[in-house]
């Protein structure tokens, strides 16, 4: 026997409920499925925006008669009568202070005064009223209470996903996203449905409710609108294109630059805004032969008579211009920018391209860009100079074919570094050296007559003797396998297959043109010191120019066996020879697969 909750007398509702507006009365209502506790809220301005029921005030709220259901106003009082006869008309309705909002007559949870004290008002409703209620709800039936997926389900109407303080806004157009208000919070409820999967009992006991179709997408929240965090690039001219005339001028107000601010899109937005730039009739370009050295100046001067009179007060601007014309061009000189018509260029939006200065040395244009990485480090530069001096390529050329580098190397080899320092910066070729005489060297700055005589004598000898015959480079010379094996100190050629690590062996580039093992660090390895690696993984050993190439090969093998063809020096011990023959008889080494370090 369950205890019946406290029931107030009938006159309590009529007297105290209207006088004291802070009283909240909970009343149990009998239903077929389960007892439903209806929370009775008094008529406050916070609720007055939700549901006008009078006919005279329904025109202010378009969502009442609109064909689109407003999910903001759908609540649990759809389960009871919401017809116009259910309005609570009280002749003794107290006057509320004006807050800028019109007052309406609202039902108390949709219960009419004739039925608000009846515990079984569900049974007293007629079929016409239920049909009217269902028709205005625009749902086929009040379903979703028992968790049926095919029916619309009840969603919680809370302050986390909606705001009942916000004004009732009609449904926006489909292409435009809804305007989010700042005081809305994120939807923190992680449940898709409010019904538990294990129980058929609906959870009607927490807060207000609204109808929501399961298959229909809900009102997008702020978290959904801000879900895309990547910056998007959009052109605002597609949204509101700026109309332009045929002359290129922007039609519209010229007082300010109009930039639209759109708040419906995510925060991280990269916008491309069309900015209005007032132009003259033409864009002035300075002709130049160099690519990318065009100076474009967009002027905003108006063709008024006063502009031509202001040419006397001109601005002097220092410009750097590079032209390949035959006419002499003043570089780094103050230049007055003015049009051919005499209009002064006072526009601050002038776009100038980056141009390169003319080099003082003509030959640096070709040599500075190539091999720039080699000139950055001093060690590489000195090594390159030593290699050129050792190779002495100028000796194998005729004087007519010499370049500036060949001339400088010849002077350095002749112990004339002072003369070479004087010639740096001149565009000298071998053809110029054929016309040298004592007077020419004096004009170049060689003041000592003895040095001039010595220089001319060496040059005449080189011209008479001609270029030296080309010699084969010993370092790059290909040595045949016959020449290598013919060495008397080596008498064995072995085929070895073993996995290695980078710490097992130490190699160097030997005199035979291939890598030679200098130290064996690993244990139980078939390799020995002084072994020459003739072939490594079916590649000729002479292709491995340095130990770093073998180290990279060992690292890339990742523990796999590496095949070596080894040229080994003969030994005096017969025991070692027999062990070496046994290891090389099958062509595969008997060493363990994982050498110990």
From Swiss-Prot:
Residues 402-465 form the SAM domain. Residues 293-313, 581-597 have a biased composition (Low complexity). Residues 179-189 have a biased composition (Basic and acidic residues). InterPro entries: SAM (IPR001660), SAM/pointed_sf (IPR013761). Pfam families: SAM_2 (PF07647). Residues 169-178 have a biased composition (Pro residues). SMART domains: SAM (SM00454). Residues 165-197, 278-344, 576-597 are annotated as: Disordered. This is Uncharacterized protein C05D10.4.
